[in-house]
Amino acid sequence: VNIANIPGGCILESMKITIFATQMKNTLALILLALLSFQTTRASQLLIPMDEQQAEHLKAYGIAYWSLQNGVPIEWLLNYRGGSFLCPNIPTLSKECTIRGVTFEIVADAQAQQIYAQIADPEVNMERVKLEVAPKIAVYTPKGKQPWDDAVTMVLTYAEIPYTEIYDTEVIQGELVKYDWLHLHHEDFTGQYGKFYGQYRNAAWYQEEVSNQQNTASALGFSKVSEMKRQVSINIRNFVLGGGFLFTMCSGTDSYDIALAAENVDICESVFDGDPSDPQAQQKLQFQNGFAFQDYRIIKDPMTYEFSTIDATEEHNRMGEINDFFTLFDFSAKWDIVPTILTQNHTQVIKGFMGQTTAFKNDYIKSNVTVMGQTKSLGSARYIHGELGQGQWTYYGGHDPEDYRHLVGDPPTDLALHPNSPGYRLILNNILFPAAKRKKQKT
């Protein structure tokens, strides 16, 4: 048809009909989407209980992460049955729960509304938090380390939560901006190689680690490992200042804080860096640069397996395994939502576990730090949290929550034997924390 032979009015009418048809099509699509949304709202939901009824607490976090990865937002019901997850009842999600052995319940919409009403009651210490986007996770760990060398990588692997390994080179090169959440392997950020010199200086693994660290420092343009670790520490601090989430355990806590406080002073003896430490090192510490601690004394002796007076390992060692527990604080879910998220658990009393840094003496914790778990009888904190700039950080004392006295060379913990570990749950609370759409803290 030659469009030039069609009267202009007909063309106009034809265009109007086409536009009308397109509008009707779009309208019908919106109506259909609305109907589907209505049906989804009216449909049943999938509840992943996190109380004693849950068979696989640790893998349940993996299900939550998997759901977010696949674009399905879920709700974290804080303090409801141990911090349960409420998800859309999607066949693929229930199938994944079954495959991983995670306990779930199908609840009708009316029942879900009752749960919401219970949580909304101002007299009830519960809250709903929407989880929206799976955080990008980085683990700062030396190349060649196995997952069982570190509790966090071990539980991430068990829970089937993906992560990327990075180390000094990547941090120095500015790659932290790619991630939302960073865990520090049980590292020594002071440049003293973990203070293992006294006992292991002749061990092949120790000598290899020293050599690898020195080679990396040289390749990155640093004359000493301590200088490289100092810059790594500063870059991590900038990551938190810019909105990142930092989680670290064991010696990655106090050694990191000390490295920040010693930013402008040499605290390493000659066996570590080839020159003596500053004799005025203690007086030159700048505690304000650290995240959590102040007024402690550093221990420079290479033969002493300790960084400072912060650590409460000796006190916990005297207490003994049978009596070593720490208690989680009970926070207001509607007012102090951040520590509430980080302390979700199915028990409030958790068995202790040793590490190079086991716990933190209360005397050295800054006043603006939130203590979330403590052993009151010893005056020590196990689990602490704080804010810096736009970001957040969490320190957790001890090495392995299911191995009371983990020693160098010990076999890995089999988490299949500890699927409900309360101590490991605290790690995974931190993993999901960046995914939460948080309300502004009111206290």
Specify the residue positions occupied by each region the protein language model found.
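Intrinsic-disorder-associated, low-complexity terminal segments enriched in Asp/Asn/His/Tyr and depleted
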Residues: 2-5
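Bacterial N-terminal signal peptides
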Residues: 27-37
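Hydrophobic targeting/anchoring helices
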Residues: 43-150, 159, 398
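Extracellular ligand-binding/catalytic regions of CAZymes and related secreted enzymes
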Residues: 44-86, 364-443
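Helical hinge/lid and interdomain linker segments adjacent to catalytic or ligand-binding clefts
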Residues: 45-46, 51-55, 85-86, 90-95, ...
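Catalytic beta-strand/loop cores that center a nucleophilic Ser/Cys/Thr
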Residues: 150, 157, 254, 273, ...
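Catalytic cores of eukaryotic secretory-pathway lumenal/extracellular enzymes that build
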Residues: 261, 270-272, 281-282
